[in-house]
Amino acid sequence: MGEHNLLNPGFVGPLVNIHTGDTFYFPNFRPSGGQLPGLPSLSYPRRDNVCSLPWNPSEPCNGYSQSYFSSPVSINPSFNRSCEITRADDGKCYYNNGSGSRENCSGGGSLKREDRARDTSALTSDHGMHAGIGSTVAFSKYDYGTEQLTQDPPSCQSMESDSSSSLLNEASKPSSSDTQTLVSPGSHTGTITASGAAPWYPMHTRTRKKRKPYSKLQLAELEGEFMMNEFITRQRRRELSDRLNLSDQQVKIWFQNRRMKKKRLMLREQALAYF
C-alpha cells in the first residue's frame, strides 16, 4: 500500500481522473476548460512559458487551447494587459473587422480572419440571393423588355454630334422660308411657311387694316369746320360723321392731328423769324 501523500501520483491521479504517472495536476490549480470529473479523460497539452516576461505578471496568461472549441480561445479575449509587450508598430499589419477596431493579422489571427471571411462570404451570398429574388419580382412587375435594358446609352460625343446636325438642319430650313417671306412680304399674312412650321415672328400673323385715305370732298368739309372751330363738339362731330360717311372716331382723330400740325407750323414760323 502506498502512503497517502499529496505528491504521490497514484493517489492524486484517480482523484482528477488522470492516469499518467509522470504528470500530476492539483484540483485547485486547474486551468480554464480543464477536465471535469464527470467527463472522460482528455489529454490537455501543457503550454509553458506563455508569457516570457522578466517579471511575474499580476494576472495569469490564460492561453490554453480547449479541444471542444473550433479554435483556441483565451479567457481574456479583449486585451491581455499583462501579456502585451510594447513594441514598434512598424512590424505589425492590421485589418479592420467592420466595427472600426484593429486586429493583428499575425499568429492566431489568421484563423479568425479565415472564419470571418467565410462568414462574410455566406452573408453576401444570402444577401445576393435575397436581392436577386427582389430584383426579379421588381422586374416582373415593371417589365420593359431586355433590349431596352441591355442597350448601352449613347456617348456624349454622339449626342453632341446628333444635336449639332439637327440644329444645322433646322437652321437651314428657316433660311429658305425667310427668303420666300422677304420676296413677298404682303402675301404671308395668315399663311404658313413652306417648311410646315409656324412663322418666326408673331407680327407676321397680325392683319393690319389697310389705310383708307380721305377723299377731297371729305378733306374740304373737315378743313372748313376746322377753320371755324378748332375744337369740335360731340354733336357737331356726329353730324359730320353722318354726312361724310365717316366714323365718329375718324373725325375725332383728324381734328387732333390737325391741331398738332397747326402747332408745328407755328413753332417753325417762330424759329425762322428768330434766326
From Swiss-Prot:
Source organism (scientific name): Takifugu rubripes (Japanese pufferfish)
Functional description taken from the UniProt entry: Sequence-specific transcription factor which is part of a developmental regulatory system that provides cells with specific positional identities on the anterior-posterior axis.
Domain of life: Eukaryota
GO molecular function: DNA-binding transcription factor activity, RNA polymerase II-specific; sequence-specific double-stranded DNA binding
PANTHER family cross-referenced by the UniProt entry: HOMEOBOX PROTEIN HOX-C12, HOMEOBOX PROTEIN HOX-D12-RELATED
Keywords linked to the UniProt accession: Developmental protein, DNA-binding, Homeobox, Nucleus, Transcription, Transcription regulation
GO cellular component, one term: nucleus
Region (Disordered): 101-129, 148-213
Stored SMART domains: HOX
Coiled coil: none
Gene: hoxc12a
Keyword flag Nucleus: yes
Family of this protein: Belongs to the Abd-B homeobox family.
Record SUPFAM superfamilies: Homeodomain-like (SSF46689)
Main location: nucleus
Subcellular location: Nucleus
InterPro entries in alphabetical order: HD, HD_metazoa, Homeobox_CS, Homeodomain-like_sf
Protein name (Swiss-Prot/TrEMBL): Homeobox protein Hox-C12a
Biased composition (Low complexity): 155-177
Pfam families: Homeodomain (PF00046)
Compositionally skewed regions (Polar residues) per UniProt: 178-194
DNA-binding region: 207-266
